Design a protein with these regions (language model features):
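N-terminal "arm"/small-domain region of PLP-dependent enzymes with the aminotransferase-like
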Residues: 1-52
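Conserved PLP-enzyme active-site core in the AAT-like
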Residues: 2-10, 76-306, 322
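Conserved N-terminal alpha-helix of the aminotransferase class I/II PLP-enzyme fold
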Residues: 34-79
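Short active-site oxyanion
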Residues: 68-70, 97-101, 443
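Structural signal for conserved beta-strand scaffold positions within catalytic alpha/beta enzyme cores
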Residues: 72, 124-126, 220, 345, ...
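Conserved C-terminal alpha-helix-loop-beta "cap" of PLP-dependent enzymes
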Residues: 298-452, 457-462
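Flexible, glycine-rich loop/tail regions that form catalytic "lids" or insertion modules at the edges
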Residues: 428, 467-470
Length: 471
């Protein structure tokens, strides 16, 4: 597959043209990549008005992912989330009242800032009480979604869309096919934050990508699981989305810089050639190595590694339950760090490791050696290790659902605010969402009154201060 952006920039760098244009480094500098860092010069196209090499590269990505249309972002899925919500708002019927989005509660804070910027309300989908034991995970069954939509209809409210995160930070995958069928039966678009799942289209057993499973709008953080520089992402449109080319590019431009990174654009462009060539084979090798490691861990410490297989598990994320070792997630992450392995995420219970198709045999061997050593040294599972308590999340959900909303998300985010100790925040209006990052998933959302039930979760996830609306 051709790489028009990469080819253009390399030719330009080889010409040694006198650069009387931005950026200021003029193709020279300490990093060594400066000669490939350009701006929208003649022939370089423009990301938000693409008609040349960028449009050609995006057409390649569209073909690879099998979507109706795929667009690039150099500012991560956060930009794509805002853009697809803007597009969904434009698709709703005129004079439909105040807009509301039905969203799973484990949404990234980018959704909340989109709500503040676009001024819509959210109606939250909470997990069933017995499935609510982790901040990152919010399983939603099709039957529960259908019931929630029926309840909103009985109140005379119709959401402009349904929003899900899948896969989530711990590797849980929603039933996108079943949930999309419910959405479409109600005449609603399904929007999916697939930031962690760009690779799902390239599985040897067939695509598990949300667009192929019925989602209407979807974002992928290419940089999370593909060989792409940080910030590279995709906005995917399904065939049901009727927005014209200008509307989509304007939606992205509304939330993006007028100086997109050409290094990231080249990275997205170069990835097309990799995806079209050897990526599926490399991905399969990575999955085989990961499966072997999980089987070894199951033999060493049953329950340590969460399953990689099954309809609700993603196959490229190794999630470790540190309680199986009598450790906290943070302790296990530190033990790995001391042995030369840096994890993606750790909380009081879990550690998340994210290998990819680019992970080498030597890197897997290092991880294997580290985990074998830790398993050999760690005590047997200690019941004193604090487990995630489903009752704590269920209590928070009940408290938040029962309270009247005094501020919209927009009003709370834009209001004068102050930082106070989290323990003193009860009864105050949350201004900025209270999150730990990663995973940047709020415990209390902007506009909600902080209930006492939030305090144990603040403590558990290390949130010591809260931004509240000034009184």
């Amino acid at each position: 597959m051709n790489t028009p952006v990469v080819d253009f920039v390399r030719r330009y760098a080889q010409q040694r043209t006198t650069r009387m244009h931005m950026p200021g480094h003029k193709g020279r500098g300490p990093l060594g990549c400066e000669e490939l860092d350009i701006t929208e010069i003649a022939g370089a196209d423009e990301l938000y008005e693409a008609e040349g090499i960028i449009a050609q590269s995006e057409a390649n990505a569209t073909q690879l992912f099998g979507t109706a249309r795929t667009y690039y972002s150099t500012e991560g899925s956060s930009q794509c989330i805002r853009a697809m919500l803007h597009l969904a708002l434009q698709m709703r019927p005129a004079k439909a009242g105040r807009p509301v989005l039905l969203a799973a509660r484990n949404a990234h804070k980018a959704l909340l800032y989109a709500a503040a910027l676009l001024d819509f309300d959210t109606q939250w989908l909470w997990p069933a009480p017995d499935a609510a034991g982790a901040l990152c995970t919010c399983p939603v069954e099709p039957e529960a979604l259908s019931s929630a939509l029926d309840e909103l209809a009985a109140e005379g409210r119709t959401p402009f869309g349904v929003y899900l995160t899948s896969p989530d930070y711990l590797g849980f995958v929603q039933d996108i096919a079943g949930l999309s069928a419910v959405c479409h039966a109600h005449g609603l678009p399904l929007l999916v934050d697939n930031a962690h799942g760009a690779y799902l289209h390239f599985l040897k057993e067939g695509s598990r990508h949300p667009i192929q499973l019925g989602a209407d709008l979807c974002c992928d953080s290419a940089h999370k699981t593909l060989p792409v520089l940080t910030g590279g992402a995709y906005l995917h449109l399904g065939s049901s989305v009727q927005a014209d080319e200008a509307a989509v590019r304007n939606a992205l431009a509304l939330f993006g810089s007028t100086s997109p990174s050409y290094l990231i654009l080249q990275s997205l462009d170069a990835a097309n050639a990799v995806l079209a060539d050897s990526f599926r084979e490399k991905l399969d090798i990575c999955r085989w190595r990961l499966g072997m490691l999980c089987r070894e861990l199951d033999a060493l410490r049953p329950g340590l590694a969460l399953p990689l297989t099954g309809a609700h598990r993603e196959p490229l994320k190794l999630t470790l339950d540190a309680a199986a070792l009598g450790l906290s997630g943070q302790q296990l992450a530190q033990a790995l760090r001391e042995r030369g392995v840096e994890c993606e995420y750790a909380d009081p219970r879990y550690v998340v490791l994210m290998p990819s198709a680019e992970s080498s045999a030597a890197e897997f061997a290092c991880l294997q050696t580290a985990l074998h050593a830790i398993c050999g040294e760690a005590p047997a599972a200690d019941v004193s290790v604090a487990a995630d308590d489903p009752a704590a999340f269920a209590a928070l959900a009940g408290a938040l659902e029962a309270q009247p909303r005094r501020f919209t998300i927009r009003e709370a985010v834009l209001a004068p605010q102050e930082m106070i100790p989290a323990a003193e925040a009860v009864g105050r209006i949350c201004a900025a969402p209270a999150v730990s990052c990663p995973p940047a998933i709020p415990i209390v959302v902007s506009g909600e009154t902080v209930p006492p039930e939030a305090l144990p979760l603040f403590a558990r996830y290390g949130i010591e201060k809260a931004a509240v609306v000034k009184e």
